[in-house]
Amino acid sequence: MNQICLEYFGNSVARVKKALENLKNGHGVMVLDDENRENEGDFVFAAETMTVEQMALTIRHGSGIVCLCLTEERCQQLELPMMVEKNSSTFQTPFTVSIEAAKGVTTGVSASDRITTIKAAISQTAKPADLHRPGHVFPLKGHPKGVLGRSGHTEAAIDLARLAGLKPAGVLCELTNDNGTMARAPEVIAFAKKHKMTVLSIEDLIEYRQTHMETNFS
């Protein structure tokens, strides 16, 4: 990631700290990965605090595929198997089966219904029967070591929520342009400025965890 284009949001450490503060206060952030990887920017919200209004914004400007990033332990608790036994996707995106809240939703696709599903999945007392399968929310299972084990948006979302002192669960969705193409760094930065959101890179988060000895969450 060309860090120069992110200087508007501060240096690497400042961007992470600002992102954590925003998440603590219930706001979303934009996360960029490497241009040699997926080369895209994702909305990232803490699952614990995401609102219906934020979900509506995400659906309106995103790809429509809203993902709930969960730890391996939470996926086991909810008995969420992987979507396929052998993952042959380019970046090994760790999709589990999709989900829907068993109660409190209609079609499951509205912003309100998706928030209901997310809250059901991250509830302290959540159990497998609380979720129907398939559904309109797509869980992703994070690497146990976070971004230090896999430099993906999934791990970044979980790490950011955890470092912000919230439940280790995040919601993400890729930002798209009005013509349906994927938003790259310039478009992501322009969108973030317009909507007063912080932008950081996964590289920023990796460096932050390494520098601050945040190498083990156990």
Curated annotation (Swiss-Prot):
Pfam families: DHBP_synthase. Its EC number is 4.1.99.12. The record marks 136, 174 as: Essential for catalytic activity. The keyword Manganese applies. One of its GO terms (biological process) is riboflavin biosynthetic process. Pathway: Cofactor biosynthesis; riboflavin biosynthesis; 2-hydroxy-3-oxobutyl phosphate from D-ribulose 5-phosphate: step 1/1. SUPFAM superfamilies: YrdC/RibB (SSF55821). GO terms for cellular component: cytosol. Keywords: Lyase, Magnesium, Manganese, Metal-binding, Riboflavin biosynthesis. Mg(2+) 1 binds at residue 38. D-ribulose 5-phosphate binds at residues 37-38, 42, 150-154, 174. Mg(2+) 2 binds at residues 38, 153. It is an enzyme of class 4 (lyase). Binds 2 divalent metal cations per subunit. Magnesium or manganese. InterPro entries: DHBP_synth_RibB-like_a/b_dom (IPR017945), DHBP_synthase_RibB (IPR000422). Homodimer. Belongs to the DHBP synthase family. HAMAP family: RibB. Catalyzes the conversion of D-ribulose 5-phosphate to formate and 3,4-dihydroxy-2-butanone 4-phosphate. This is 3,4-dihydroxy-2-butanone 4-phosphate synthase. It comes from Hamiltonella defensa subsp. Acyrthosiphon pisum (strain 5AT). The lineage of its organism: Bacteria, Pseudomonadati, Pseudomonadota, Gammaproteobacteria, Enterobacterales. The gene is ribB.
